[in-house]
Amino acid sequence: SRRQRQMCIRDSSTAATLTSLKLDNGEQLPTLEQYLKAAKKTKTQLILELKAHSRPERETLAVEKIVNMVKKLGLEKRMEYITFSLHATKEFIRLAPAGTPVFYLDGKLTPKELKEMGCAGPDYHLSVFQRHPEWIKECHDLGLKVNAWTVNKPKDMKWLIEKNIDFITTNEPILLQEKVSD
């Protein structure tokens, strides 16, 4: 049996504390820069989630540092940003290069509000689209992309595919590939 442990990481955690942590596989927790340098060696599209911080000023500082690091490493064209924080969403839109996809995760804004903000679209929990199935078409009509998370049941995958969703986040990628192929 695997040893289970929990880590509590806050926006006040220091880099020294975080990089001293060992992951379950024995590796050190990498810094964002180390992670991005490793990702640079691949062709993978990158999606970076910024967790909400305790204060807006901390989020702005985090967004500035992230956007600058991504630029320094030449990864702007492969990067997308997601966050539950409305403030951080607006900051990514303001500070990232024009056209960088920024998706809002919280499920509280309509397609029209997202479009007006400059978002690439919603990245909402499946239940939001079950309550508002019309939002998928509204997003597409506005030129937005749509992602649903975390979708693990075949019937939910099928429903979203039938609604022409653009992206699905899942813990069951093989099952999803089968549903897409059906």
State what each model feature region is:
Residues L29-A39:
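Short, charged beta->alpha transition segments
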Residues R10-T19, K41-L50:
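Short, basic/glycine-rich phosphate-binding loops at helix/coil junctions
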Residues A16-P30:
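Glycine/small-residue-rich loop that forms an oxyanion/phosphate-binding "nest" at active or ligand-binding sites
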Residues Q34, T42-D182:
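Short loop-to-alpha-helix "cap/lid" segments that border enzyme active sites
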Residues R2-I9:
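Short, small-residue-biased leader/transition segments that mark boundaries at the very start
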Residues K22-N25, A39, A96:
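Alpha-helix boundary/capping residues
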